[in-house]
């Protein structure tokens, strides 16, 4: 029997509640498909600060690096807003990504038929949307040097540097090409090559890699047009490849096509390391401990972990099918509630998902 080591990071707010739901479903689906998941719970974020004074204990990072996959729930709490920036819960996530050498962020956006009315766009625009945003995580303007604020010519000036090396572009492009090959074979690379030298390099490197993926259709789109097309005609996209800044913006725009951030999973990947899988939503401290949380993004993140991180594709499909079945049956948590549907709390939704398996 195959064994997989999975680190669970419940984190803060609603994190422990949605982690409990995901764990029970993972245990059930692993038994059905004949593999074993060995779970290791670790601290991160505010819960780690409370326990040991640091948002990312060394023991947590060591455990994550030694695992086969990491499943994170949520990080953050306003209780820690008065701390120095480098001591806040969110720093734990940044340190985890850096320590695990994760450079590729994957954000799938897929319209669930039962929730098509939740989107602010017309059904005929978003019906059938199934796209993946692949965002580079460790380069670009967020990390480029030099950066800072200085006094110059009698006034204050702020500056940042947008920079990418050819190797940085190549490794994220390879992730996107591989995904496009597994999906529908269409890759759209997003840049601003008409005005930015760094984007011209980006486009050149993508074009240089394209011949090795002759089965993938490659196109390029300026970021401003991509932002417009995501709203105008999102079905045209399969895999979107972006740099750090553009991906940060476009992935959030794409997320809202679904109408609820409570349904969106994500993955962060490196070259030779475990993947980190987490919901897009935050820790929602205002509803923590009240059995109101929507666990579905966490469950779908667990499905991504099974498919991408552990190569258990049939088990992943079972989890995704359970989510579809429950929604089609009219069960909803409060954030998705609509007329004619049945309201469930977090634990009851977990039970419904378990039954749907």
Swiss-Prot record:
Assigned keywords, A-Z: Amino-acid biosynthesis, Branched-chain amino acid biosynthesis, Cytoplasm, Leucine biosynthesis, Magnesium, Manganese, Metal-binding, NAD, Oxidoreductase
EC category: oxidoreductase
InterPro entries named among the record's database cross-references: IsoCit/isopropylmalate_DH_CS (IPR019818), IsoPropMal-DH-like_dom (IPR024084), Isopropylmalate_DH (IPR004429)
The record's free-text note on cofactor binding: Binds 1 Mg(2+) or Mn(2+) ion per subunit.
Pathway named in the protein's UniProt entry: Amino-acid biosynthesis; L-leucine biosynthesis; L-leucine from 3-methyl-2-oxobutanoate: step 3/4
Gene3D superfamilies: Isopropylmalate Dehydrogenase (3.40.718.10)
Annotated EC: 1.1.1.85
SMART domains: Iso_dh
Residue(s) at site: Important for catalysis: 142, 192
Description of how the protein assembles with itself and partners: Homodimer.
Protein name: 3-isopropylmalate dehydrogenase
This protein's encoding gene: leuB
